[in-house]
Structure formats: structure tokens, C-alpha cells
């Protein structure tokens, strides 16, 4: 009886044969590993390109246009430029910066704020809302045109219409509109179109710029800014909410050392005595002008302290009738008192700015005596505080009132709705929410360093830290943090500013900020340094137009002179005296010499060399013999180590 066959015994063999045949067939139509090339030296029978092209990429479009124009391109070889990673600073060159400044001056008139559309008693609430939305949309389109067509960078302005509605209400109900700006860069936070809009609503309203954080400026720097705004015919007041709050807190506690807040301004008390007397005379002169104009017609605006729901844009019959009557009274009053206005115009336009820091009482007196025209509400002076977020509007109100009436936060845009507060009978302060108004900037790094954009939400830390390194000299950074920043190479400029990597590496090593791989945590270090820059620990003040930034920051030069002359600079930690410098890789490889060693075999020392132990001195040999342990065979260590493995790096 024969052997029984498997039910599908021949299936595997036929499958392998079939796979081999299919592989040979497919190999004929696929590319092989052999090197082939298309020479295209024969006649092209498919020369007619009948392929339809409806869309092309930018590169294909450029090449097709060049082919139609008959342009030929030749590869440019041996023109290689190596850009190291540390050169990625994200900052503009001098030529690019000058070009952008020129574009800013040419398109300066397009920077405006949205206006409230005109309305009367016949306008319905729906029509007014639709008109406001249309004007706001047109304003948004104009700013988008600036960004796209002119390639300009704008600050992230406010895009919520409700915030602008609150600004309109504050301006309409204020007799004095105060713009609060940062003393380190006043022109960035100043909105010139807001001043024009205030005068458009009512010519009797006054514009004032309150320069907060002025204690960060020296007396010479404040004098320079006061002279600049005097030429611009703008009234400015130098004020520091934090310094005044410390001063008032010390006085209220009755401490013997309660003049700690006064120490900030004690340097300038002697130079500001004459200015205080002139200011007193000016306030008396303005009080006489106010008494002369107190007989003007009274406006019938509603009270400043209203509920939140009364500040909507919807039209109310009572408010509309009052405002229409007020408009008629304004027209009549303008025709009657035109002669008196003409006599007071030269006195109004004459601006006297003083560079000393004002106190709380001086600030209130200036507010009271500044407005000499017709008030919005009879017997009450309303001062509206507007400006960018995080410039100190709420802090100013808390300092003036003496207690915390408005919540304060380091986060920009903390105030969500306006508030009206009475300082005393007849004086009302109105705190407007912080509005980021459109302004020109060069880079987004400038917005981060100015406090406009939050530091904790930044994505790239290199450009803002590079801007800090450009503004703050090397010796100031080293003296502030007690660090030693690595020096430039010998072939580099020794006076160049440090890069962001050099600063963050030194700061991270000093603070112990390390990543999981043992490297300095540069993003974390960048957040600390940028917050110190925004808070004023690393101080840089922008000069007025036309002034040299280096000479304007003369305190940096004084610190360098003290360091050169051997003056004491108090550091936070003990500094290492060793100066680290960036090593030159080419020089290190050129001057590097390998160690010369003698190769021996056996366990006996030859010419002073012992296998595995290197050079052996006579003292070591005598001490080894005197130990009395001849059975110890220490010479067997690394005795059989092959030399070709130890010195394989010397082979070609």
C-alpha cells in the first residue's frame, strides 16, 4: 500500500513558482539599481505640451514667466555664506530700521481711533448700533490695509467694540482727558489722534499727558522730555504712583524713617524749589481765568456716577434730549463768548511744563486749575483717565484716594469696566479700561519688552532677549545679576553686545535653571530677565527724537567708569576671577599637540616608564621597595593592553 499524500501538498510549490514569475514580470517595468540618465539629445517627438495648467505654485509661476521671457539662470557656485545659530537674533539692521521709521512717518496720518457716529433724537437704537458697527468695520479695514499693503507692524489693538464705546462715554463726560503713559517710552503709549478726537467733541475739553513711573528718570532726562512736549504744545505732568504711595504710607504710619518714599525724589528737591514757585503762580493765574469764565452757560449732561446698564449705546429719550439741548447751548455760548474766547486763546495755548515729580496734592491742584472753560456738569470737574493696559491708571487712582478702590494686577487689561470715584466734592475721577490703541512698532520683540504683550505667552524668547542685550550694556548685566558673561572671540569686536544664548546660559547656570539633559534652561531664564526689564530692574529709557540714546543713558557710562577706576560694585554672588572666552575651533585644532608617551613591554620599568603607570620617579621606586610587600604585582595592570587600540586615533 502506497504512502498517503497530503491533501494540499503541491500548493506551496506552485505558489513559490507563481511568485517568482510575477516578480520577473514586474522587474521588467520597474526601475532597477543600475545608473541611467536621460540625455535628451535626440528629437523630442512629444514637443507639443498639451497639458492644461490652471494653478501653479509661486516657484513654477516664476520659472514659467522666466522661460517665456527667454531668461537663463546660471548656478552661482563657491559663494557660500555660513550663518551660525547665534546670529539668529530676530532684530533689524540699521538700514532696515531707518527704512521702517521712514514708512512710519509717511503713514502716520492713518493711525486713528474709531469715532462714534453722529446721531440725534430721531435716531433709533438699532440704527445707532448698526452705524457704530459700520464705522468700526471700516476702521478695521483701514488698519488691515496698512499691515498688508504697506508691510507695517502694528500693536495688537483693541478689537472689542464695547471697550471703545466705554472710551466714547468717558471722553464725552470728562472735562479733562488724561493720557497715562510710561516714562521709559512715552511716545509709544501716546495716541495723538485721541487728542484730536477730544478737541473734535468739545473744544473746551483739555488734554493732559501724565507721565507715570517718572521716578525711573533722572532730572536731566525729565527736563529733556518736558522741553520736547513744550515744543509739541502738549501739557505733561511727571508723576510716580508707586513712589507717592510709599511716601504716603510712611507718613500715615508715623514712622521715624517714614521718609523712605521721599528718598526717591530727595535728589531733585533743591532743583525743583523754583519750579514749584512758578507752578504755584501758574495755578493762581489759571484760577483767575476760571473765575472769569464761570458765568458761561451750564451743560445738562447726566451724572457721571451711573449704573453700568445706563452706559449702553442704546439711545434714551432723556439723555438724547439733554445732549441735544446741550449742543444748542454750546452753539449759542460759542457765538456769545467768541470775543472772550479770543482774548483767552493766547493764554490757553501757552504751555509750561515742569520736570519735577508732583505730589498727590500738587496733582489735584493742577487738575482743578487746568480746566478754565465750561464744565460738562455744573459745579463738578470730571477727570477721565485713559491709556494702555498696565501703565498705572488704577494705581494712580488708588494713590490719590489713599485706599484700594480699584483692583490692580500685573496682567495687562485687568480693568474690565470703567469706574467713577469722587475724590472730594466737586472732583470726580473716571477710570477707563485699558485700551491698546494702534501704534507702529518695528518688531514684536519691542512689544514684549514694552509690556504690551504678556511675557508668559511668548513663543520665541530669542528676539526680545536680544533686544535687551542691545539696550543694556554687558557690564550692567554682569553687575546686576553677579554673573560673568563669556567674552567674544579674538577675531570679534570686543565691544559687541552679548548674544541671547550667552546671557541666558550664564544666568541659568547662576540660578540653577537646568533642563532634563543638564543644559541651562534658556526659556525659563528669559522670562525672568524680561520681567526684570519690564519692571525697571534693568532700566532703559528711550530718548526724545533727535537725542543720542548712548548719551541719554549716561548712568550706564558712569557705572562703567566706576568699574574701570576700581570702584566697588556690589554683586549678589562672589564672582569667579577666571575670564571665560569663546574658544576658536581652528586655533585649537591647529595648536593642539598629542601627549608623547613611551611604549614599553613587560613588568620592569624601562627608562623610568612602567607599563600602565606612566613615568615613575626614583622616590616612588624606593618607597615601593621599602613597603615590604614583594608579593604584590601592581605592575600587571594594563600590561596586556594593545597599543594599537590605545592610539587608534593617531592612525590615518
Curated annotation (Swiss-Prot):
PROSITE patterns in the cross-refs: G_CP (PS51721)
Chief place where the protein resides: cytoplasm
Pfam families assigned: MMR_HSR1
GO biological process assignments: nuclear export; protein transport; ribosomal subunit export from nucleus
Keywords attached to this entry: Cytoplasm, Endoplasmic reticulum, GTP-binding, Hydrolase, Nucleotide-binding, Nucleus, Phosphoprotein, Protein transport, Transport
EC numbers, comma separated: 3.6.5.-
Binding residue positions for GTP: 212-215, 387-394, 431-434
Domain CP-type G positions: 164-438
Annotated region described as Disordered, given as residue ranges: 288-347, 625-652
Composition bias type Basic residues, residue spans: 630-652
Catalytic activity line of the entry: GTP + H2O = GDP + phosphate + H(+)
CC annotations in GO: Cajal body; cytosol; endoplasmic reticulum
Localization terms from the record: Cytoplasm; Endoplasmic reticulum; Nucleus, Cajal body
Superkingdom assignment: Eukaryota
Chain positions with Phosphoserine modification: 93, 252
InterPro entries assigned: G_CP_dom, GNL1-like, GTP-bd, P-loop_NTPase
GO molecular function: GTP binding; GTPase activity
Biased composition (Acidic residues): 293-311
Enzyme class of the recorded protein, top EC level: hydrolase
Role, per record: Functions as a GTPase. May act by mediating the release of NMD3 from the 60S ribosomal subunit after export into the cytoplasm during the 60S ribosomal subunit maturation.
Family affiliation: Belongs to the TRAFAC class YlqF/YawG GTPase family. LSG1 subfamily.
Swiss-Prot/TrEMBL domain comment: In contrast to other GTP-binding proteins, this family is characterized by a circular permutation of the GTPase motifs described by a G4-G1-G3 pattern.
Protein name as it appears in the record: Large subunit GTPase 1 homolog
Organism expressing this protein natively: Bos taurus
Amino acid at each position: 500500500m502506497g504512502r498517503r499524500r497530503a491533501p494540499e501538498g503541491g500548493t506551496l510549490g506552485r505558489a513559490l513558482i507563481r511568485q517568482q514569475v510575477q516578480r520577473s514580470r514586474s522587474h521588467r517595468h520597474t526601475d532597477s539599481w543600475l545608473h541611467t540618465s536621460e540625455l535628451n539629445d535626440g528629437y523630442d517627438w512629444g514637443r507639443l505640451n498639451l497639458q492644461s495648467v490652471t494653478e501653479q505654485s509661486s516657484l513654477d509661476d516664476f520659472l514659467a514667466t522666466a522661460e517665456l521671457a527667454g531668461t537663463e539662470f546660471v548656478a552661482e557656485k563657491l559663494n557660500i555664506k555660513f550663518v551660525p545659530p547665534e546670529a539668529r537674533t530676530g532684530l533689524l539692521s540699521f538700514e532696515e530700521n531707518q527704512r521702517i521709521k521712514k514708512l512710519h512717518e509717511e503713514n502716520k496720518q492713518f493711525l486713528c481711533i474709531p469715532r462714534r457716529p453722529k446721531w440725534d433724537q430721531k435716531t433709533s437704537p438699532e440704527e445707532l448700533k448698526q452705524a457704530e458697527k459700520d464705522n468700526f468695520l471700516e476702521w478695521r479695514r483701514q488698519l488691515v490695509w496698512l499691515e498688508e499693503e504697506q508691510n507695517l507692524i502694528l500693536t495688537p489693538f483693541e478689537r472689542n467694540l464695547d471697550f471703545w464705546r466705554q472710551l466714547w462715554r468717558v471722553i464725552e463726560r470728562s472735562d479733562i482727558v488724561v493720557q497715562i503713559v510710561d516714562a521709559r517710552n512715552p511716545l509709544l503709549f501716546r495716541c495723538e489722534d485721541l487728542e484730536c478726537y477730544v478737541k473734535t467733541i468739545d473744544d473746551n475739553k483739555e488734554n493732559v499727558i501724565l507721565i507715570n513711573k517718572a521716578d525711573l528718570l533722572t532730572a536731566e532726562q525729565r527736563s529733556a522730555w518736558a522741553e520736547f512736549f513744550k515744543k509739541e504744545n502738549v501739557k505733561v505732568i511727571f508723576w510716580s504712583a508707586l513712589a507717592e504711595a510709599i511716601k504716603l504710607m510712611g507718613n500715615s504710619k508715623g514712622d521715624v524713617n517714614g521718609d523712605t518714599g521721599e528718598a526717591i525724589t530727595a535728589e531733585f528737591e533743591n532743583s525743583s524749589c523754583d519750579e514749584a514757585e512758578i507752578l504755584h503762580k501758574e495755578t493762581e493765574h489759571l484760577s483767575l481765568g476760571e473765575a472769569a469764565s464761570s458765568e458761561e452757560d451750564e451743560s445738562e449732561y447726566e451724572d457721571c456716577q451711573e449704573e453700568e446698564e445706563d452706559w449702553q449705546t442704546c439711545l434714551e429719550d432723556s439723555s438724547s434730549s439733554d445732549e441735544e439741548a446741550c449742543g444748542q447751548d454750546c452753539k449759542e455760548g460759542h457765538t456769545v463768548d467768541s470775543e472772550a474766547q479770543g482774548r483767552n486763546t493766547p493764554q490757553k495755548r501757552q504751555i509750561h511744563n515742569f520736570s519735577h515729580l508732583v505730589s498727590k496734592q500738587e496733582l489735584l491742584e493742577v487738575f482743578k486749575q487746568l480746566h478754565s472753560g465750561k464744565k460738562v456738569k455744573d459745579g463738578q470737574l470730571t477727570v477721565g483717565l485713559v491709556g494702555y493696559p498696565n501703565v498705572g491708571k488704577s494705581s494712580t487712582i488708588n494713590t490719590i484716594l489713599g485706599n484700594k478702590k480699584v483692583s490692580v494686577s500685573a496682567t495687562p487689561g485687568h480693568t474690565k469696566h470703567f469706574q467713577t470715584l469722587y475724590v472730594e466734592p466737586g472732583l470726580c475721577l473716571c477710570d477707563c479700561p485699558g485700551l491698546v490703541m494702534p501704534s507702529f512698532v518695528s518688531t514684536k520683540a519691542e512689544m514684549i519688552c514694552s509690556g504690551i504683550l504678556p511675557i508668559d505667552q511668548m513663543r520665541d524668547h530669542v528676539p526680545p532677549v536680544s533686544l535687551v542685550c542691545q539696550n543694556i550694556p554687558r557690564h550692567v548685566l554682569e553687575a546686576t545679576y553677579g554673573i560673568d558673561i563669556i567674552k567674544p572671540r579674538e577675531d570679534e569686536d570686543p565691544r559687541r553686545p552679548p548674544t541671547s544664548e550667552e546671557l541666558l546660559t550664564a544666568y541659568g547656570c547662576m540660578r540653577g535653571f537646568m533642563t532634563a539633559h543638564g543644559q541651562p534652561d534658556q526659556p525659563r531664564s528669559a522670562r525672568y530677565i524680561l520681567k526684570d526689564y519690564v519692571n525697571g530692574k534693568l532700566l532703559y529709557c528711550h530718548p526724545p527724537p533727535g537725542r543720542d540714546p548712548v548719551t541719554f543713558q549716561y548712568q550706564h557710562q558712569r557705572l562703567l567708569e566706576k568699574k574701570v577706576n576700581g570702584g566697588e560694585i556690589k554683586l549678589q554672588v562672589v564672582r569667579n576671577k577666571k575670564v571665560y572666552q569663546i574658544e576658536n575651533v581652528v586655533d585649537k585644532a591647529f595648536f593642539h599637540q598629542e601627549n608623547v608617551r613611551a611604549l614599553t613591554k613587560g613588568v620592569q620599568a624601562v627608562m623610568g616608564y612602567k607599563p600602565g603607570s606612566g613615568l615613575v620617579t626614583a622616590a616612588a621606586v624606593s618607597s615601593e621597595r621599602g613597603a615590604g610587600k614583594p608579593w604584590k604585582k601592581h605592575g600587571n595592570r594594563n600590561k596586556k593592553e594593545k597599543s594599537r587600540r590605545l592610539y587608534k586615533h593617531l592612525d590615518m
